[in-house]
Amino acid sequence: MASIIGIDLGTTNSAVAVMHGGEPVIIPTAEGGRLCPSVVAFTKHGERLVGQIAKRQSLTNAARTIHSVKRHMGADWSVNIDGKPYSAPEIAAAILEKLRADAEAFLGGPVTRAVITVPAYFSDSQRQATRDAGRIAGLDVVRIINEPTTAALAYGLAQENLHTVLVWDLGGGTFDVSVLELGDGVFEVKATSGDTRLGGDDWDQRIVEWLVEDFKTAEGIGLRDDATAMQRIREAAERAKIELSSTVSTRISLPFIGARGDTPRHLERELTRAQLEHMTADLLERVVLPTRTAMADARVTPEDLDRIILVGGLTRMPAVVNLVTELFGKPPHREINPDEVVAIGAAIQAGVLAGEVPDVVLLDVTPLSLGIATAGGVFTRIITRNTTIPVRKTETFTTAVDNQSAVDIQVLQGEREMAADNIGLGRFQLSGIRPAAKGIPRIQVAFDIDVNGIVHVSARDIATGHRREVKVTPASGLIPEQVDRLIAEAAANRERDRRKREVAELRLRIDDLMTDAERVLADALGKLPSVTTQPLADAVEQAKQTPAGAGLGQLRLLADDLQRISYEVMEALYRYNAAERAARAAGVPTAGASEGEAPHADGDTASADETSADGD
């Protein structure tokens, strides 16, 4: 049976893992990393780039590069590229396709099934959008699972003498906290809470705002409308945030960030950990209420917790660790890389579903209450939050006016008392109700939540047997027919997309080789004769003139020629430098090679057209 992979579809980075030899293993990306940046870009030539290659070119292509798409899952959001709108599931699908391709390369065969993780506090619309993304990527999403639950799996906590565990997950774009009860291989989530709009991106944005405002005050130059400058600042902000987790201050240096007239201006700022903690104090404060809510819902105190697990890259920050320690009165555990722990847990759950991991049972919960709108605009709950899933519950309702022959049923998710303040999941009408005085008809409304946390709703008139089911469509606007079309498009274009990616990667390789070649040529100036360096200069010029429509064969030839000729010139330069050092050591004066001459290893020079010693 083909392996089921586990995917952590993250806001900043994503990861994929699989059970291999009985152990969960992170699958490396094609570029050699363990994490894949959750970045998708479209080049001006129409190629789609994903991951590290997309992130590398974002400075020169900021307007066509998409970051943090996870924050838009389930929302009515799209990005327009060359006149074509792309929804959040379509962009996320590009990331999932990349992870799937990396997994296939690692496993040496096709991959069609996956477990995909989501924040515990994701709504039904967000979960549906994630499932759609998987389908568009050509994956059968066998389970949508909450990230904190997979973290507990990764730690193998059911095998230890632990009973109550709290998972505290602060990632790139979302925050979750879950309380789990463990015993005899059973992982039961007792309560969950969180904020799907809080994460590392918000810390980055505070640094960005500080840099932009500070630069405007100091230089009188606004940078907000300069897409390239803002992308440079965002990348610098993220680097600074990461560095301040391990050092007390960092230097942010962005030369030529702007100009006043013809005079370039540079951004040079020192940022301390104390400054960052001060400017983000309110963000950190926002994690406190969801943490206390989850504990109250689970009816536990800090003393009841056997272990606190930290998940997510932002939990490396000392301020975060200190806050968690203060909240619970005990230090958290961070033995597993917080950026990889969710993918590892997803692989274990995939192993459970494939029968590779025995004696483990997951009992997850729904993060928000589900119900319908009733008379007076009230939200009537049918399934309350933190109910263990899968679950089915029914309630009986009646009509509000005499001789009512139909009822509109509005399906909602949330915790507010009024219907208008909650998340609308769908609406449908049950007709054919037998005319009667109000309060007489009996209408049974049933809510089903499956193991993926996805909702199915039906209504039935008990007297007539008439029944209707709601089609819960995510706010992303993708109906099943659209998803099917996108799946077909992705499958039909997979080979073409692979070739486009190869072309894009080759172009980037050629750009890197040209940069290296120009550096070599600059270093060789005055040292090597033009007969040695001219082929490299010609190759660089030829690469610069490459037409936009150049094919794979032409690009490979260009790249190989550039690399080969560069090596030849570098070898000649190495021999020259070695000869020069030897001459200096011997006290012999040296000079740069003249036209048509190249240095010998002993420090002498020989004409390029010099004949052999015997004159033949």
Name the predicted role of every residue range.
Residues 1-75, 79-85, 101-616:
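Oxyanion-binding/catalytic loops of NTP- or PPi-dependent enzymes
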